[in-house]
Amino acid sequence: MSSQIALSPAIAAAIRRPSSHDCLSASATTATATPMALKSCIVAPLSLFTSQSQIKHSSSRKTSRTTIRCDVAIKSADSINADANPSSSPSSEEEIEAEAKAKIGSRVRVTAPLKVYHVNRVPEVDLEGMEGKLKDYVAVWKGKRISANLPYKIEFFKEIEGRGLVKFVSHLKEDEFEFIDQ
């Protein structure tokens, strides 16, 4: 009885000799009902990687079969179809994006009690009641939808003592502001 180790199909293809007696592991014959399928690996004789003296030495002690599993999870066609969310069609997302992009440049007024702390040399700025300009809709990046928690980028101008008019940008949710001119 010879010791065997398991190889990935790519490695086995690179080192396999035409006369080697490889067999598929048991995971290749079992069908899974889960969306993730397992790609089987090849079990190759240990003699491909070790010298005969090491095999004889190891087999004289105790004959144990060593198999290393190297199954790789891959997505099946069912899982790819299951990933597509049937409730949100691409056309509705495109409509939402087009609607938001059409509003860029509009004047907005902040309705929620918000404070920002990222204006230079000012401890905090209260945004409630301030008017600004909608600069960008950032929930879509390079044509793909991203999970932006605050998708609207709004530019504000505020008069600060000793500094004059200061421009800063803040990201807000849709329910935190209202459109002044539509």
UniProtKB/Swiss-Prot annotation:
Keywords from the named record: Chloroplast, Oxidoreductase, Plastid, Transit peptide
Subcellular location as annotated: Plastid, Chloroplast
Pfam families per the UniProt record, alphabetical: FeThRed_A (PF02941)
The keyword Amino-acid biosynthesis belongs to this UniProt entry's keyword annotation: no
InterPro entries: Elect_transpt_acc-like_dom_sf, Fd_thioredoxin_Rdtase_alpha, FTRV
Transit peptide, residue positions per record: 1-81
GO molecular function: oxidoreductase activity
Gene inactivation effect: Subtle developmental changes including slow development of young seedlings, an increased sensitivity to fluctuating culture conditions, and slightly delayed flowering time. High light induces rapidly chlorosis in leaves.
Recorded coiled-coil stretches: none
Any one Gene Ontology cellular component term annotated for this protein: chloroplast
GO biological process: photosynthesis
PANTHER family: FERREDOXIN-THIOREDOXIN REDUCTASE SUBUNIT A1, CHLOROPLASTIC, FERREDOXIN-THIOREDOXIN REDUCTASE, VARIABLE CHAIN
UniProt similarity note: Belongs to the ferredoxin thioredoxin reductase alpha subunit family.
Record note on quaternary structure: Heterodimer of subunit A (variable subunit) and subunit B (catalytic subunit). Heterodimeric FTR forms a complex with ferredoxin and thioredoxin.
Function (record text): Variable subunit of the ferredoxin-thioredoxin reductase (FTR), which catalyzes the two-electron reduction of thioredoxins by the electrons provided by reduced ferredoxin.
Protein name (database record): Ferredoxin-thioredoxin reductase subunit A1, chloroplastic
Organism: Arabidopsis thaliana
Gene: FTRA1
